[in-house]
Each structure stands twice: as C-alpha cells, then as structure tokens.
C-alpha cells in the first residue's frame, strides 16, 4: 500500500506489518500554522481591551481555534484549543484560570476537534462548511456548560441553566453572528489560496 503525501498514514510494509509514514514538509507546515493560530488566540482578545464583558460578547478566541480545526484537522484543533486559554491565563492573567480558563480549554478543544473531524468527513461545499461550523459551535458550548457544572459542584457552588443559557447563547450573540459570517468567508478564501482543501 502506498502512502499519500501530505499527512501521516498507516502503510503496509513487507511481511504484513504496519508503519507510519510522515511527510516532513507537511508536519512543518502544520506546526507553523498551529503556532500562528495559537498566536492569534493570544492576540485577538486584546482587541477587547481585557474587558470581560466585551470579550464574552465577541468571543475572539473562538475564531482561530475553529479555523485551526478546519485547516489542520481535529487533533490539531483540539490541541491548540485546549492549550490556548490555559497558557494565555498564565502569561497574561486573562482569562482567570479557575473556572474560566479551565472551562474554556475544554470548550475550545471541542470546537477545534469537532470542526476538524466533521470537515474531513463531508463534501467540501459551503453548506457542509456551515453544517460543520454550527455543529462545532453547539458542541463546544455544551462541553463548556458541562465543565462549568462540574467545576461548580466541586466548589460547592451552583451553575443553573439560566447561567448556561446566558453565557453560551444570550451574551455571545454578537460573537456567534460574527463567526457565522466571517469564518466561512475566511475558509473560502483559504480554499482559493490552496491553504486548505
């Protein structure tokens, strides 16, 4: 079995054993793009001036993680999404580590994983792009709510459904609209530039 270039694959060697073949250029490209998306996740929240209320409305960290999942695939999206809020909290003190950065780590990891996995499984059309994007956005918010509920239980506090609804949907409406408008436009541009499939 021959390996297709551009991504790690399981290949059948002589004797029936399997091995993994990796294209060094593809790995380097993925690392560079992952670092770029991670840097954007650090920088974009600065446009809100570290004002939590504005950040909650615009959700600036969501953009590079969703893009990372689409461009690089689910595993990269998961890794960059999980790392970004935790490292940013350590470096800049924002978002606060507990419970916000921790819950965001799981939320963004879900965004990156689901968007990447779905995009690899569907036809690369604009309707399927929207379907993958919306599914990832819903999955990430559900994961965020579940983690916040667990963390609240660990500290003896409460996280009612009204708090979930406010944080996941009502407060974030401007960011949700911006994601639905801008991310497909960016992805189509990246497709035309041959940066992604």
Where do the model's predicted regions map?
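Hydrophobic transmembrane alpha-helices
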Residues: 15-71, 75-76, 111-120, 183, 187
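Hydrophobic alpha-helical transmembrane segments
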Residues: 31-36, 63, 67, 78-82, ...
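Alpha-helical transmembrane segments of multi-pass membrane proteins
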Residues: 62, 66, 105-112, 176, ...
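Interfacial aromatic-anchored transmembrane helix boundaries in multi-pass membrane proteins
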Residues: 43-59, 83-118, 152-154
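Membrane-embedded alpha-helical hairpins and interfacial helices in multi-pass inner-membrane proteins
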Residues: 50-55, 93-102, 121-197
């Amino acid at each position: 079995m021959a390996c297709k270039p551009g991504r790690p694959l399981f290949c059948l060697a002589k004797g029936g054993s399997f091995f993994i073949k990796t294209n060094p250029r593809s790995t380097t490209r993925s690392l560079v793009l992952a670092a770029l998306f991670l840097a954007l996740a650090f920088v974009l929240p600065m446009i809100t001036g570290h004002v939590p209320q504005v950040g909650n409305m615009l959700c600036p960290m969501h953009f590079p993680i969703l893009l990372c999942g689409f461009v690089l695939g689910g595993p990269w999206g998961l890794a960059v999404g999980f790392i970004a809020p935790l490292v940013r909290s350590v470096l800049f003190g924002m978002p606060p580590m507990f419970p916000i950065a921790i819950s965001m780590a799981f939320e963004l990891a879900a965004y990156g994983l689901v968007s990447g996995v779905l995009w690899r499984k569907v036809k690369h059309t604009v309707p399927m792009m929207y379907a993958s994007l919306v599914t990832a956005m819903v999955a990430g918010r559900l994961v965020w709510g579940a983690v916040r509920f667990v963390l609240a239980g660990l500290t003896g506090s409460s996280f009612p459904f009204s708090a979930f609804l406010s944080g996941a949907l009502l407060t974030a409406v401007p960011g949700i609209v911006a994601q639905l408008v801008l991310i497909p436009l960016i992805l189509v541009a990246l497709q035309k530039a041959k940066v992604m499939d």
